[in-house]
Amino acid sequence: MTCDTNESIDPYKISISSENSLNDHVKQRFERGLSALLTDPYFLLLHVPENGAKMQIVQPAKNSYHRERMVKRINEAKGIPSFYYALSHLWKVSKDDPHLWEEIGEYVDDLDEQPAEPVSMRPEKRDTLLGLLKDHPGSYWWIDVLCARTDTPLDIMGDIYRCCLECIAMIDCEPSVLSKLHTEPNKRKEYIDFDWFYAMDKPSPEDLLYFKQQYDKYPELLYHLAKLQQSEWWKRVWTWQEMALPFGDVRLMAETDTQRLQSNTITVDDLINSFTNAADIDFYVNKTDGVDAEDVVGFRDVRGEWILEISQARAFSKHDAEKNHAYQFVVLMLSLGDSTRRCMDHVDYVYGVLGMLNIKIPRMTDPKAVWKRFLSELDNHMDMADIKGEVISVAGCGRGKIIGIGESAYKINLQEFECMGDVYRDILDMENLS
């Protein structure tokens, strides 16, 4: 799988260096995903030249020059074995108000080396994006409005975000909000999960002391998290897996931040650390006499479901070696069942989660056909991963045996539902053993 030298008989073969610090499982995942992408004619990237020349859309599968450069970067990487950035952003456009960026052709040439056609992008985001690209000479980017076409398979998105070097998420918030969310590493837990909340029902005196220290150190943390929670970026279906899938960092920045200061950004993993510290503060306020919750700004405004959804999805993806573990699978489905995320096209309730489950479904427009195919593929996934028949215990839900897909799931009509939770809340059939 790996090579010990920089020499390669085939300049287009991905063979990550044995000097790379990542474990073999992660290397294999990148080798498979990137090999598939670089030979896929639907995979397009935006190239930002080193010399400041006009940017160009390239097709690695048919462009030997760029493909060879990409493979070289992958094979020689010491850290994340990838070479391109992926952009996540909130469209907020409509047929009546598409916000066409007519001037994009002044900055970008399409595959045919002609100026790119107008794309939809709100005006307030354009200078931020152009500045971001200018800051990364010699880089490659996957940006949906430029690189995805009407015939691009939707199930390719999983590999695109999973295998990127870094995902930059331009979100709708004030730049100053993100700078106030940095906190010191929590000493007790990396990720928040269901067990975490229930285990802290009766905290020890030592726990309460630590919670108080967090409260004294970050008295306004809950307030700033409540402001971040208001961002529409957290409320869309597609941004769920764009946030969760990348093995590398997912870096949040304000879509209007033309200064692009590093201090005004935060990674999702660092944000989750702040979630953990915020949970400590929450427990302290709840369990301590003499502390009035009404005096803690933001205490009533931060939704626990929002925190759990982000933490569970990111943990599920980062702990890829355990992805097929029954417990992780069920917890992920439970978090989907609590999600309030929405989409414009009902089939996206399926296509927006395929990457997390490693399921491939061809692009279809009929919601009933999409859901039927999804249930078939999900059932097969549970068989192949030996999930059925497993007995697990989830805090707050009890002990149960996983039977499979619930009967009610086969009666679901995607067009009748208004959010992700409505679709996935009762998808699993479990026998209660409590």
Regions found by a protein language model. Give the residues of each.
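Short helix/strand-capping turn motifs
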Residues: 281, 285-434
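Intrinsically disordered, low-complexity acidic Ser/Thr-rich regulatory segments
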Residues: 205-232, 317-327
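Alpha-helical interaction elements in eukaryotic regulators
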Residues: 125, 153, 157-160, 236, ...
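A residue-level signal for conserved active-site and pocket-lining positions in enzyme catalytic cores
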Residues: 87, 161, 240, 353
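Glycine-rich flap/beta-hairpin and adjacent strands of clan AA aspartyl proteases
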Residues: 227, 231-257, 369
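A structural signal for short, well-ordered beta-strand segments and their strand-loop junctions
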Residues: 86, 142-143, 168-172, 239-240, ...
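Metal-dependent phosphate/diphosphate-handling catalytic cores characterized by acidic Asp/Glu clusters
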Residues: 1-140, 148-153, 163-164, 168, ...
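GT-A fold catalytic core of metal-dependent nucleotide-sugar glycosyltransferases
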Residues: 138-165, 249-252, 258-263
